[in-house]
């Protein structure tokens, strides 16, 4: 195989990857972008995440990992604990003859197009995995399958806590006036329990959202502004449908992000943080990156493996959220 070092590696430098990713079409990460815009994403320059950092966001020590460990250190007689976070590592393999033909052509544009296409494919898969983690984390607990070097499957278990429980409600026979009263009462109860109402959003399960829409549509001249995400009602209440699911690796069963008869209030001004830990990769300079990709020469069979990695942890502030069971029928 034509030696690729220096011929492909230059396309995979940190700055080159960052430039490629910045020019790619933005991946669809609906909940990740809703809860964790750029100012809520934090890069930690360590492969270990301090429990104190997460506790500051969530109000609770969050992690129990089956088969894993936390790492205690004792500087100046003060015990600090760190999470040894698992990362996302995926790859694509290319046979030697494919790479030979590509490099031997000497066409820089073809090589760059090949690099871009495969970086986009791997970037999208990591983005999809991050979105799945965020969707599952909204429940307050992550139980995500992972594989070890020996091929033994396990689970990364992260317990972020539970949202505040609100008094159950019924909108079974509600009219538009009852709907406003319910929203205001619910928001008031949330404020007392969560202490945060800067930018509240009502996230409704499928049955609740469908019922709210029917009530609004049945009312004449209801003060509603329809949006791409849902509706703004009475000029105050940001209401969105959360009829979404996620599917874990190895499963064919989709899981609802929230139940059909559930309502969740989240403060978009204080949802928590999406933390990226430093990668265990010297070629990446052990840096925290939402996405990194590099080529690795393989033998038996000969070829190149493109390896992509990321270490995300969606740390929701669960005590700033509230959940309610709503009867609709």
Describe the residue ranges of each PLM region.
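Assembly/oligomerization interface modules of large self-assembling protein complexes
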Residues: 32-101
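Extended, solvent-exposed, turn-rich assembly/linker loops in the middle of proteins
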Residues: 151-223
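Long, contiguous amphipathic alpha-helices that act as assembly "spine/axial" helices in icosahedral shell
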Residues: 83-159, 190-203, 302-308
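Short glycine-rich, low-complexity/disordered patches
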Residues: 33-34, 199-200, 226
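Sequence/fold signature of self-assembling virion shell proteins
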Residues: 217-329
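Short, solvent-exposed loop/turn segments at secondary-structure junctions
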Residues: 144, 208-209, 312-313
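N-terminal alpha-helical "arm" segments
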Residues: 1-46, 320-329
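Hydrophobic alpha-helical segments and helix pairs
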Residues: 8-18, 22-27, 137, 147-178
